[in-house]
Amino acid sequence: MARLPKRKNRRNEKKKNANASRVQNVPRTFGLWKSTERIKYTTELKYLNSKCRAIRLHPDLVANNSFPTYCSAWKIDQVEFEFVSYMSPLAGHVGCVFFVVIPAKGLNSRISADEAESLQSAILWDEKGRLKITPISGPISRHPWTNLSQVVTPPQIPKGSTDGERQDLQSGYYLIFDSRKLFGKDLVDKQSVLGELSLTITATYWTSLS
């Protein structure tokens, strides 16, 4: 006589499914203390012989900032950007200086100067011809000695992106500084200082209450 198949306990299955969905719906910042801080970072930008430079934007950008090192998660909300040109009005500058913000690929990702240079051409456009990164500024050579400022909301990192990062928490961003198309009489030395860059970063971080 053939043995009848065991009946499934649908009640237990429903409990398992309910518990699984409940765990998935709990955000990773649940039970953590949320706070918003503003930090400021200032640096001089040099010509560096037509090389791109990558500055990683994250709460530890400034050595003595108010972001605790024990924070469980953080994200950048806004970047207030200001560039003061040191270039001489009489040097006959031609070309542009560009700043762009791109999402980092993960918490521990790093970008070298050479990689930043390749990113300028590789990541500017997607397959459909749409801009993938956020340009901050355009030409400044026509108005030297003037401030160039802008408030930028960084592009959101898509869910399910590389390194398994959820949303944009702890991923950070890179500011790519490109002076390759700028020429002038006072840029003969690759160490020539183009100007001063000031960044005010508004970020949210979550810490444990204990």
UniProtKB/Swiss-Prot annotation:
Compartments where located: Virion
Comp. bias (Basic residues): 1-14
UniProt KW DNA-binding keyword: no
Predominant location: virion
Annotated stretches, region: Disordered: 1-21
GO cellular component: T=1 icosahedral viral capsid
Keywords for this protein: Capsid protein, T=1 icosahedral capsid protein, Virion
Described function: Capsid protein self-assembles to form a baciliform capsid with a T=1 symmetry, about 18 nm in diameter. The capsid encapsulates three genomic RNAs (Potential).
The name this protein goes by in its record: Capsid protein
Organism of this sequence: Ourmia melon virus (isolate Melon/Iran/VE9) (OuMV)
